[in-house]
A protein has these predicted regions:
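Flexible, small-/acidic-enriched active-site or ligand-binding loops
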Residues: 142, 201-231
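A short core secondary-structure module
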Residues: 157-207
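N-terminal glycine-rich flavin-associated loop
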Residues: 88-110, 137
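A short, Trp-centered hydrophobic/proline-enriched beta-strand micro-motif
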Residues: 122-131, 175
């Protein structure tokens, strides 16, 4: 086994790693391979985490959560990915953990008291955030889905893309314009967040789902969603009307650090698979791992991953810094480094396997698909570099 215990963890991080690792040990490589191939959500895995309260890792203790911080979340999600679940396995619970953040920070006390304890216990899932739109893409302020006040309700109409896990969620957080873009001084104004009861939306005939036939992260389904006169009670507005975009930004950097940790876990998994195969496979009378053409790409992948890992875990300790721009720099750097390292590592693992690299039975083809995805989500590598160029290097804004 490749030694990757290179980061000094706190006592609490070690406790999280061990507890979550024990759960992950119950789900082997075959479990994830089969669920990915079938496009099946891993209910057993997620339920096992929920039963131990891990979906409430970031929720305050007063609402039944564990009350932990980004440091512990990084350890938790890294452990899940590294266990064999990969990036997609971590993504099956990632949203359940982070979609509650707007409610914690901005929701009414009545809403928090009712819903958050159920989220912490796993009895209610907020697995879905509906933001991206076909025309807006990464330009989130350009969304056109609108929410119009009608008495004690909002009526929502619009179309969203890449809305994931709506098929396994009880609620979703929806971003919509409550003031048209042309009527606000800043393009970041006029967006609001809403908590949507998915079952109620289906019963009213206001949700139309079209599943996207994608090639990565098979255990998580994604959809094009059309909202047709969806009525949402006014008390399900999260926070202050027209300030939803700022609510989305709050906590975004911390989430990117967790994404980076998941990505590092995936990359280490790929390197280990490559090393194991390189030691076992013999050609021309010797193990292929004896050849530098095999050794060097795997060694380089390992080195890059350990650098990204060190940066990610170190940055997680600094998320309480009041300088949010600095936290943003750490988060975007970690995300960029981790995605580049994981992709190179997964590619090396596939190449090491030769023709077997595209055989599902060896898993590395899945790791490569997932590693490629990490260069696109939650933001592209180019957007991460844009942030660094403008906010760290002091270069002119490019967009």
């Amino acid at each position: 086994m490749v030694a990757t215990d290179t980061v000094q963890l706190t006592d609490r991080q070690r406790s999280v790693r061990d507890a979550v690792g024990d759960i992950c040990d119950e789900f082997d490589a075959a479990y994830w391979r089969e669920h990915d191939a079938e496009g099946e959500y891993p209910h057993d895995f997620v339920n096992a985490l929920a039963e131990e309260g891990w979906l409430g890792v970031l929720l305050p203790e007063e609402y039944g959560g564990k009350g932990y911080s980004t440091e512990e979340a990084v350890a938790m999600m890294y452990t899940i990915a590294r266990s064999g679940a990969g990036f997609s396995g971590a993504q099956t619970v990632h949203a359940a953990i982070y979609n509650s953040a707007p409610l914690v920070n901005y929701g009414s006390e009545e809403l928090k008291s009712d819903l958050l304890p159920r989220v912490a216990s796993g009895d209610a899932w907020i697995q879905c955030f509906s933001l991206t739109e076909p025309k807006a893409g990464s330009e989130s302020t350009a969304i056109e889905t609108e929410a119009v006040r009608d008495g004690d309700e909002y009526v929502i109409n619009g179309e969203k893309l890449w809305t994931s896990r709506i098929d396994v969620s009880d609620y979703l957080v929806l971003a919509a314009r409550t003031t048209p873009r042309e009527e606000v001084e800043k393009k970041t104004e006029g967006v609001s967040l809403f908590l949507v009861d998915i079952e109620r939306g289906h019963e009213a005939g206001s949700l139309d789902l079209e599943e996207i036939d994608k090639t990565a992260s098979g255990v998580v389904s994604s959809f094009r969603v059309t909202y047709d006169d969806l009525r949402v009670p006014a008390d399900r507005l999260i926070g202050v009307e027209d300030e939803g975009f700022y609510q989305v930004l709050d906590g975004l950097n911390e989430e990117r650090l967790v994404i980076a940790a998941e990505t590092v876990g995936l990359g280490e998994l790929a390197v280990e698979k490559g090393v194991d195969y390189a030691n076992e496979r013999e050609v021309f009378g010797r193990a292929i791992g004896q050849n530098q053409a095999i050794q060097h790409p795997l060694a380089a992948g390992h080195a890059r991953l350990q650098a990204a890992k060190q940066f990610t875990f170190a940055a997680a300790k600094r998320t309480g810094d009041e300088d949010r721009k600095a936290v943003g720099a750490w988060a975007n750097t970690a995300k960029y480094l981790a995605a580049e390292a994981a992709f190179e590592a997964a590619d090396a693992a596939v190449q090491t396997h030769g023709g077997r690299g595209i055989d599902r039975a060896y898993d590395v083809e899945r790791y490569l698909r997932e590693a490629r995805l990490t260069r696109l989500v939650p933001v592209t590598q180019e957007l991460a570099l844009n942030y660094l160029g403008e906010n760290v290097l002091g270069l002119p804004r490019s967009y």
